[in-house]
From Swiss-Prot:
Mg(2+) binds at D71, E140. Allosterically activated by GTP, when glutamine is the substrate; GTP has no effect on the reaction when ammonia is the substrate. The allosteric effector GTP functions by stabilizing the protein conformation that binds the tetrahedral intermediate(s) formed during glutamine hydrolysis. Inhibited by the product CTP, via allosteric rather than competitive inhibition. Gene3D superfamilies: 3.40.50.880, P-loop containing nucleotide triphosphate hydrolases. L-glutamine binds at G353, L381, G382, M383, Q384, E404, R471. Residues 292-543 form the Glutamine amidotransferase type-1 domain. It is an enzyme of class 6 (ligase). Residues 1-266 are annotated as: Amidoligase domain. One of its GO terms (cellular component) is cytosol. InterPro entries: Class_I_gatase-like, CTP_synthase, CTP_synthase_N, GATASE, GATase1_CTP_Synthase, P-loop_NTPase. This is CTP synthase. CTP binds at S13, D147, I148, E149, K187, T188, K189, P190, T191, Q192, K223. Catalyzes the ATP-dependent amination of UTP to CTP with either L-glutamine or ammonia as the source of nitrogen. Regulates intracellular CTP levels through interactions with the four ribonucleotide triphosphates. The active site is at C380, H516, E518.
């Protein structure tokens, strides 16, 4: 029987609902419970797949190929025993699309389709389905309490809490405790009004997570409890931390897991063992020295656009006991600049992306890394550009390009994938006229790594599974020419023999991959490719001293 914890936010947005929810999930998992998580997004887009990274940040790809909110990345990084799927994230757009499709088919037998019950029932069905087979499902509602867009979701939560009952549901509400310097005190009124907003729609919070920059004394906690109908021990302080990976320990010290287990009747559970989290924090806060990675992209003004890459580099730093400083380099600006901005880098990374804008700057950075022996990692578009750069400057194809940028190029090193097998083994077909949304090669795919290559050595095995999100792929017609020039194809897809990884054997560390390894990195386990990349950056750092 699944128990549900609903997570809402009030006062302001960006309080960290996702991180707080994931930290609670990690704590419950450490008690031996089977935990999953769900994110409900109120926007009308069907999914974030076609949204600008400047609008939404990163699109996180699940194993089964769902394009989801970046919060699902937090969920997977904090949980070890649960992988997110397309069931774990849905939007208002997805719900309305589903309901309208049913109406067009006549499923409602001519009845009037309304927000209540049709939309709310659809939301409830999705929540219950996502929670099947788990002890606890933690469900985050995007946005802020009081937003008009989230009202159907809040009503669905209210109904579920009534239908499932007190012993199977809880609500955790995040609020802000602002500090007024002129008065030298924390203000509780915004929290009171936020809870009042919840009460007005029939929902009583059970736990309050109070975000603050300062310590909160017992009197303030009692005051908050008095005005919000919450137990004083359920007023949890979440003070700004040096790293988000300290938060599970902070919640444990305030007995958040005990509150939940008591409510749900979970007895005879072991104490939470947070040793792994303590080790992560210790390594993160006590690095031996700093290495610098230049990340060359076109969305660098918003680091959340590369959230999983940033986190994977952080995790690799933990594994190597170094601090990884990311220097963001605007690819467009680099096109008109010299490469001096890259000279302080111990390693260079070109992440995934779409479109022609900034590609010449990225290839400029790739050429610099290749010619100067700087460790280089290319991801998705970064791999495609590494192949094009090599073809232009080494393999004698100066007009080499991708059909994404130039359909009439003389040397189409990169072309549209027209056919491939999806994660279910079913044939997928695409053309240049296909819709942009949901038409990519998505999700986990198997690859075979070539024996004797550095990539095979890094992974330590012949077959790997990594997640994909792309429409274009290296053109197999040019494999022979590229390999004769010195670049090695080090990995192929198991099903279609598509190029998955390339490397330059004569270079100290030059690997580029078509997939997205960042999606499977975690703070406790890291990822072999990123760990090896940062190890190479350490070697480069020592050489340059």
């Amino acid at each position: 029987m699944t128990h549900f914890i609903f997570v809402t936010g009030g006062v302001v947005s960006s309080l960290g609902k996702g991180i707080s929810a994931a930290s609670v999930a990690a704590l419950l998992e450490a008690r031996g419970l089977k935990v999953t998580m769900v994110k409900m997004d109120p926007y009308i887009n069907v999914d974030p797949g076609t949204m600008s990274p400047f609008q939404h940040g990163e699109v996180f790809v699940t194993e089964d190929g769902a394009e989801t909110d970046l919060d699902l990345g937090y969920y997977e990084r904090f949980l070890r025993r649960a992988k997110m799927t397309k069931l774990n994230n849905f939007t208002s757009g997805r719900v309305y699309q589903d309901v309208l499709n049913k109406e067009r088919r006549g499923d409602y037998l001519g009845g009037t389709v309304q927000v209540i019950p049709h939309i709310t029932d659809n939301i409830k069905e999705r929540v219950l389905r996502a929670g099947e087979g788990y002890d606890v499902a933690i469900v985050e509602i995007g946005g802020t309490v009081g937003d008009i867009e989230s009202l159907p979701f809040m009503e669905s939560v209210r109904q579920l809490m009534v239908e499932l009952g007190h012993k199977r549901t809880m609500l955790m509400h995040l609020t802000l405790l602002p500090y007024i310097k002129s008065a030298a005190e924390l203000k509780t009124k915004p929290t009171q009004h936020s809870v009042k907003e919840l009460l007005s729609i029939g929902i009583q919070p059970d736990i309050l997570i109070c975000r603050t920059e300062y310590d909160v004394d017992a009197d303030t906690k009692r005051k908050i409890a008095l005005f919000t109908n919450v137990e004083a021990r359920a007023v949890v302080v979440c003070k700004d931390a040096k790293t988000i990976y300290q938060i599970p320990r902070g919640f444990y010290e305030q007995n958040v897991d005990d509150l939940i287990c008591e409510r749900f009747g979970f007895t005879d559970l072991p104490e939470a063992d947070l040793t792994d989290w303590d080790n992560v924090v210790e390594a993160l806060l006590n690095p031996e020295y700093t290495v610098r990675v230049a990340m060359v992209g076109k969305y660098v003004e918003l680091p959340d656009a590369y959230k999983s890459v940033n986190e994977a580099l952080l995790h690799a730093g933990i594994k190597n006991r170094v601090k990884v400083q990311i220097d963001y380099v605007n690819a467009e600006e680099l096109e008109s600049q010299d490469v001096s901005i890259l000279k302080t880098a111990d390693a260079i990374l070109v992440p995934g992306g779409f479109g022609e804008r900034g590609t010449e700057g990225k290839m400029k950075a790739i050429q610099y890394a290749r010619e100067n022996g700087i460790p280089f990692l290319g991801i998705c578009l970064g791999m495609q550009l590494a192949v094009i750069e090599y073809a232009r400057h080494v393999a004698g194809m100066p007009e080499a390009s991708s059909t994404e940028f130039n359909r009439s190029t003389k040397y189409p090193l990169i072309g549209l994938i027209t056919e491939w097998l999806d994660e279910r083994g079913e044939l997928q077909q695409r053309s240049l006229e296909s819709d942009l949304g949901g038409t990519m090669r998505l999700g986990a795919q198997k690859s075979e790594l070539v024996e004797g290559t550095k990539t095979r050595e890094v992974y330590g095995k012949a077959e790997i599974t990594e997640r994909h999100r792309h429409r274009y792929e290296m053109n197999n017609r040019f494999i022979e020419a590229i390999e004769q020039a010195g670049m090695k194809i080090s990995g192929y897809s198991s099903a279609q023999h598509l190029v998955e990884t390339v490397e330059i054997p004569e270079h100290p560390w030059f690997i580029a991959v078509q997939f997205h390894p960042e999606f499977t990195s975690s703070p406790r386990d890291g990822h072999p490719l990123f760990a090896s990349f940062i190890d190479a950056a350490k070697t480069q750092h020592q050489k340059s001293k």
